[in-house]
Design a protein with these regions (language model features):
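Enzyme catalytic cores with a strong preference for nitrogen-chemistry domains
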Residues: 1-184
Length: 184
């Protein structure tokens, strides 16, 4: 039974307190690809030591014929340290995670104006992730602004909805508050 899904502050847990079943890290907590050995070992160790699932934002890497493509992803690590599932963000942020009309900008020789923009590939499936006997619907940041899309997770069987985001990189600006209003 999922009872506590927040991260305790230092000194908050007392001996005998129940440990969390799920540890949630934000979108892009570290600039590592999912296949980076350090990230893989760190997340697996946290899951094993805490006996909890870990959900963390990662840079997902495509495999097979799609190799070389990168996704903004949420990775689920099981309590035994195995990486069991990954959700790839579908609704990317224009001019933040991809350049709309990229070929148009190239024709106008304006590509250098947008070269700092991420070049993510959108995911294709709003899959639910298995956490114990629950099904978790995880959407990433900006996707929370589209309620019909979020509802698709519930339609796919999600019993718990989690939005991982890292609005902290906007600093002391109106952006995090704007995101909150859009998500309501």
């Amino acid at each position: 039974e999922l009872k506590k899904i927040s991260v305790p502050q230092p000194g908050e847990l007392m001996p005998g307190d129940p440990l969390p079943d799920l540890i949630i890290w934000p979108e892009s907590p570290a600039p590592f690809f999912e296949n980076d050995v350090r990230l893989h070992q760190t997340l697996s160790s946290i899951a094993q030591e805490s006996h909890a699932y870990v959900l963390a934002g990662t840079l997902g890497v495509a495999r097979g014929s799609e190799a070389g493509q990168v996704y903004n992803s949420a990775q689920l690590v099981a309590p035994n340290g195995d990486w069991v599932a990954r959700y790839d963000k579908i609704h990317l942020v224009p001019f933040g995670e991809y350049v709309p009309l990229e070929n148009f900008f190239a024709l106008l020789h304006m590509k250098k104006l947008v070269r700092e923009v991420g070049n993510f590939v959108p995911g294709t499936e709003r899959m639910v992730l298995p956490v114990h006997s629950y099904k978790l619907g995880t959407f990433i940041c900006y996707e929370s602004s589209y309620p019909d899309e979020v509802r698709e997770f519930a339609a796919n069987g999600a019993q718990l909805l989690v939005n991982i985001s890292n609005d902290g990189w906007f600093g002391d600006s109106p952006a995090p508050w704007q995101h909150l209003r859009m998500a309501r």
